[in-house]
Amino acid sequence: MLRLILPTLTLFALLISGPAAAQTVKESAALATMSGSALMKMPAKKLFGSQKKPADLAARAIGSYAKGCLAGAKSLPVNGPAWQVMRLSRNRNWGHPDLVALIEKLATESKQFDGWNGLLVGDLAQPRGGPMLSGHASHQVGLDADVWLTQMPDRILTNGERENLEATLVVKDRKTIDTSVWTEAHARLIKRAASYPEVARIFVHPPIKAELCKWATGDRSWLAKLRPYYGHNYHFHIRINCPRGSTTCKNQPPSRPADGTGCGAELAYWMSDVPWAKRKADPNAKPPKPAPPLTLAALPAECRAVLTVQ
């Protein structure tokens, strides 16, 4: 029993130092040699949040967007001809190769055709996907990416600027677009992203969807992919479909609003007070117990191999 406890304690000591600590071969070996039961009980966000390099396996998105992992990840270069990656300290510029290719295509085409000077790219996924130590519930299988609604400057940002530069809000409040910030280039950028067939959904703040519903002409079917959701007032969130070869990846149901665009009842709901209303707390109710952390056991079985391969 002591032989199992000591490696587990050692591994916890390595992991609690956080994502800034460099992963070593010794750490990978410790994961690979732990007993299955001990490893499965560990918090998945600690295990995956400590990984610094991708799993040297064939590229596969495994599981669902909010419960899975990523094999064979590819990094989006931090600087490109039409993009720059932000918040480099997070080491979240990893994705399935299909996602990385799509971001590069969107950056290049929006600069060439849409009057968008270049993308500032936020989080994709961790090197091996999985739950994160902070932030997103999704972004676990390398098929999600955040793109800022701020144009790239005409120079290379310093690392310090990438950590501290604030993105520009494009809304005044939860119902109103800020017309002093919003431009037609914003609209063309989002339309281009939604028009790619591999894109499943794009999450935006409700007034952004409302503005695009007013702006769009001709074929408006791309609007169906735009889903209003909280917190997307300075960036939009691209989600692509499961790639070919990712046989255990789970797609979400296609976005098919009844009106064909989502500009009707669905948008009206998000522009109302209902989704934003705070529930009244019962003063006599006992405080709920916090949910236990997601463990490796809760993820698809393949994620253990993704985690432990050296």
Write out the residue ranges for each language-model feature.
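Extracytoplasmic
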Residues: 114-116, 140-144, 233-235
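Active-site acidic/histidine clusters and adjacent loop/turn architecture
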Residues: 56-121, 182-192, 196
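Acidic/His-rich structured neighborhood in mature extracellular/periplasmic domains
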Residues: 126-179, 238
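Solvent-exposed N-terminal domain segments of exported/luminal and surface proteins
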Residues: 25-66
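Extended, low-complexity, intrinsically disordered C-terminal regulatory tails
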Residues: 48-51, 102-134, 203-225
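Bacterial N-terminal signal peptides that target proteins for export
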Residues: 1-9
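Catalytic cores and adjacent binding grooves of peptidoglycan-active enzymes
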Residues: 24-36, 40, 161-310
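N-terminal signal peptide c-region/cleavage motif recognized by signal peptidases
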Residues: 17-19
